From Swiss-Prot:
Gene3D superfamilies with a match to the protein in the record: 1.20.5.110
GO cellular component, one term: presynaptic endosome membrane
Name of the featured protein: Vesicle-associated membrane protein 4
Taxonomic lineage: Eukaryota, Metazoa, Chordata, Craniata, Vertebrata
Gene from which this protein is expressed: VAMP4
Naturally occurring in which organism (per UniProt): Bos taurus (Bovine)
Compartment(s): Golgi apparatus, trans-Golgi network membrane
């Protein structure tokens, strides 16, 4: 609901005002004309007009309720968007970490493959040397 105007003011509301203004604002006495403008007309001749005013006031109240619901929905949507943004940042960070780790693992596997190939080549060279030495020793004797 929209804020209503205060009929009685606190001292904090009127700080800095001239004393006569403060005294007039804080008086409890009000005349009939003031009451007429604050409360509206009353009596039988204002009946249909009063119904229209009530109808318009009801429509205004409905619009206010709808606007409050819309504001609540916008706030909730903003919160969900913030959560979604946090999750997407986290996902992006995880994707970057995964990419870096996969590159590191690829390098490790490449070196492991190189080591295995080097060991197999060394074993093949040793076998060839053993065979050659055996052949040389057999023909010398």
């Amino acid at each position: 609901m929209p804020p209503k105007f205060k009929r009685h003011l606190n001292d904090d509301d009127v700080t800095g005002s001239v004393k006569s203004e403060r005294r007039n604002l804080l008086e409890d006495d009000s005349d009939e004309e003031e009451d007429f403008f604050l409360r509206g007309p009353s009596g039988p001749r204002f009946g249909p007009r009063n119904d229209k005013i009530k109808h318009v006031q009801n429509q205004v109240d409905e619009v206010i309720d709808v606007m409050q619901e819309n504001i609540t929905k916008v706030i909730e949507r903003g919160e969900r968007l913030d959560e979604l943004q946090d999750k997407s940042e986290s996902l992006s960070d995880n994707a970057t970490a995964f990419s870096n780790r996969s590159k590191q693992l690829r390098r490790q596997m490449w070196w492991r493959g190189c080591k295995i190939k080097a060991i197999m080549a060394l074993v093949a060279v040793i076998l060839l040397l053993v065979i050659i030495i055996l052949i040389v020793v057999k023909y010398r004797t």
